[in-house]
Amino acid sequence: LAMAEAGNSRPASGAEHHISHYLEMWFVAQKKRVPLHGIKVGLGTLVSAYLYEALERDGVAFRGAEETYRAAKMIPPPDELARTLQRLGAPVRFSALGISRELFREAVSRAHTVRPRFTVLSLLDELGLMQRYLPELEERFY
């Protein structure tokens, strides 16, 4: 309904989809079997949910932070999302896709360039914080 109202996929396509699309393009370029879209989006959702929590935890200030943090409270915590994915038999680590650590870091760092939409990954890039959070993301989700 939100996409129909907006007239585009923006309401349902954030950083999680950008990560998925980045990886999709890599798998296609390597002529490898592309993991299911939902699997990649599920993993990207873990990253996004974690980043919103981490930014608020660290008190990162930016224009619109208060509204962003308030809206992000509607997203289930990443641990809860991970348990749900596990119950469904889905992976909760990007390494399950057979990708390297380097590709994981590249995908998370560059996925914001896939489409001209502002996401939590765009925010990290704009604030110069990507390298600060990349080790945490790698530890938790690779």
Predicted regions: what is each one?
Residues 1-84:
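Active-site segments that bind and position negatively charged phosphate/pyrophosphate groups
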Residues 54-142:
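C-terminal charged capping/lid subdomain of soluble metabolic enzymes
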